[in-house]
UniProtKB/Swiss-Prot annotation:
The keyword Lyase applies. Belongs to the uroporphyrinogen decarboxylase family. It is found in: Cytoplasm. Its main location: cytoplasm. The lineage of its organism: Bacteria, Pseudomonadati, Pseudomonadota, Gammaproteobacteria, Alteromonadales. Coiled coil: none annotated. GO terms for biological process: protoporphyrinogen IX biosynthetic process from glutamate. This is Uroporphyrinogen decarboxylase. InterPro entries: UROD/MetE-like_sf, Uroporphyrinogen_deCO2ase_HemE, Uroporphyrinogen_deCOase. It comes from the Bacteria. CDD domains: URO-D (cd00717). GO terms for cellular component: cytosol. Substrate binds at R29, Q30, A31, G32, R33, D79, Y156, T211, H329. Homodimer.
Amino acid sequence: MTAPALKNDRYLRALAKQPVDRTPVWMMRQAGRYLPEYKEVRGQAGDFMSLCRNTELACEVTMQPLRRFDLDAAILFSDILTIPDAMGLGLYFEAGEGPKFKDPVRSMAAIKNLAVPDMEDELGYVMDAVRAIRRELNGSVPLIGFSGSPWTLATYMVEGGSTKNFSKVKQLMFADPEAMHTLLNVLAESVTQYLNAQIAAGAQSVMIFDTWGGVLSPRDYKAFSLAYMEKIVAGLTREADGRKVPVTLFTKNGGQWLEAMAASGADALGVDWTTDLSDARARVGGQVALQGNMDPSVLYAKPARIEEEVQSILQSYGSGTGHVFNLGHGIHPEVDPEHAAAFIEAIHKYSPAFHSND
């Protein structure tokens, strides 16, 4: 079956640093708890992973923000912990405490028992969702697939859930670096296969979320996080539907490492609000596109203040292509959807002036 032609390719064009008429925008966690319609579907599903595993419902929540807002991309509704879950670690969610694993891995013996999951068997529900979303989108906007980075997945797998001080994962990293590298290798192979399976199923762009890379020292970041993302980028399918499949790397609090990240082979880097976009562009704008970078907490402000922040970020990046507007991290559940609408409308209103010479 031939895929329908893409009606809006603004997002893919910006990632390729090709001319655009306005700055494309999507929001991390755009399908989520801030939307009343999401809460309704989430209630039907029962629990979060049941929602991820239900093709029809995962497709529905992916589409919800696109019906409400004029966005330039859809992102697969899923979770970064699907891979460790498929490895049999017993993922569960505890109210108010986030994800937890019944069987964390903290020794070489436990790590050696891990296998790369079968992408069309244990993770087939993700690929089914990608295919369903592509059908539903019908060429309206591109679909982004994603995964957590090996380091970020490892933090959850070793800690057994969320953590504030990363003591267990850092203990493994320093006390038994060989075990840590063994774990990161199996995760890098898993993520490569996982993203390639998403691309084969129809994802037109992919993103690697390195949520916890920013807790490492520069030396450890390069050895335990970036090296494995580079490995993934090198192993990805880079063309589908007759066009390039761009890859974006995002390390939260990773602004100091943009040069090293830009040398990874990625097409774009996500930037959070702790880095100035003009600074990021001066440093790596010649090599990669940039995505970001409004603090999601600005969405608590009145629409006039949101509009002011959007203008400030557009001015910071400056004129020309190569910028995808986004938040610097996921949208907060308490945000008023009308404030998200004001954010998107402000980008539509003010960004064309920055592209008059594209």
